[in-house]
A protein has these predicted regions:
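Conserved AMP-binding/adenylate-forming
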Residues: 3-5, 19-65, 193
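Conserved AMP-binding A3 loop
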Residues: 5-9, 141, 148-174
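Conserved structural elements of the adenylate-forming
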Residues: 12-17, 130, 144, 163-183
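ATP-dependent adenylate-forming carboxylate-activation enzymes
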Residues: 38-39, 56-75, 86-89, 216-234, ...
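Short hydrophobic alpha-helices that are characteristic scaffold elements of the AMP-binding
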Residues: 48-54, 76, 207-211, 250
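ANL superfamily adenylate-forming
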Residues: 87-144, 253-267
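Conserved pre-ATP/AMP-binding loop-to-beta segment of ANL
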Residues: 128-152, 159, 183-189
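Conserved AMP-binding/adenylation subdomain of ANL enzymes
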Residues: 171-189, 196-267
Length: 267
């Protein structure tokens, strides 16, 4: 029930350290391509933001992928290093592992993961081996027009389709969203459960929070009752959701309140 908080200053420090650790994976003429197969968690965000900050191509992979689609994504995007977190991700990877020669970094339970596995703390501690990692220089080298990240559709009708994004795409999306929602700002608190492998969760909630200087709060679970508890702890001003959750909220409130009342105090 304890809330753990991270300031923007601490976040940027952790992103830089993660970038250093990622740079250790580099080989001459063979930059690492990073895959993310995980539930929403801080360490996954650190990897994603470090990749975007320092020019490592990163591919968030839907957790609802089939084995066939996961293999397709890994092969098409040429992932060299896959960060894996959570039971669903571990099961998916273990099922396809024999078909791939990919290095795995385990966010948790490395002993349950098949293949060439490095534990997160080992990966993170390797940042001390980074050579010539100058933060400002690395950022200045990042191309605004090269493919920076690929996001895949669910592949419900055929193989998943990869949508490529450059840094310029990410920036233009960010400013367009901000122009459409000028009321959002640094006083806002997001409660977020939408997956970070989808555009709304990743671009609107996560990167939007950073752009606005708002507070991004990880929901403990997407389950309705769990979200209700998170509402009480976090007191969000912004909550983005699928229609089903709004219907559930309305029905719950309708049971407890007279929503047709003219008395605003009742509501």
């Amino acid at each position: 029930e304890n809330l753990q908080t991270v300031s923007y200053s601490d976040l940027w420090s952790k992103i830089q350290m993660t970038g250093k650790a990622l740079s250790v994976l580099e080989k001459p003429e063979n930059p690492p391509i990073i895959g993310l197969l995980t539930y929403n968690q801080l360490n996954g965000v650190l990897v994603d933001l470090a990749c975007l900050s320092f020019g490592f191509r990163v591919i968030p992979i839907p957790l609802n992928s089939t084995n066939e689609h996961l293999s397709f994504i890994l092969k098409q995007s040429k992932v060299t290093h896959l960060f894996v977190g959570g039971k669903t991700a571990i099961r998916l990877w273990n099922d396809v592992q024999p078909s791939h020669t990919i290095s795995v970094i385990a966010f948790n339970n490395p002993n349950l993961i098949h293949g060439n596995v490095t534990e997160w703390n080992t990966f993170f501690d390797n940042r001390d081996r980074a050579q010539n990692f100058n933060v400002n220089q690395r950022m200045s080298y990042v191309s605004v027009d090269s493919t920076q990240t690929i996001m895949y559709t669910s592949g419900s009708t055929a193989n998943p389709k990869g949508i490529t994004f450059t840094q310029k795409n990410l920036i233009s999306k960010r400013f367009a969203r901000a122009l459409a929602l000028p009321e959002f700002g640094s006083d806002d608190t997001f409660l977020c459960y939408l997956p970070l492998f989808h555009t709304f969760g990743r671009y609107f909630e996560l990167m939007g929070s950073i752009f606005w200087g708002a507070t991004y709060s990880f929901a403990e679970s997407p389950a309705f009752n769990s979200l209700l508890k998170d509402f009480l702890m976090v007191n969000p001003t912004i909550f983005i959701s699928i229609p089903k959750r709004w219907v559930q909220l309305y029905e719950m409130l309708e049971e407890q309140l007279d929503l047709d009342s003219d008395d605003s105090d009742i509501i």
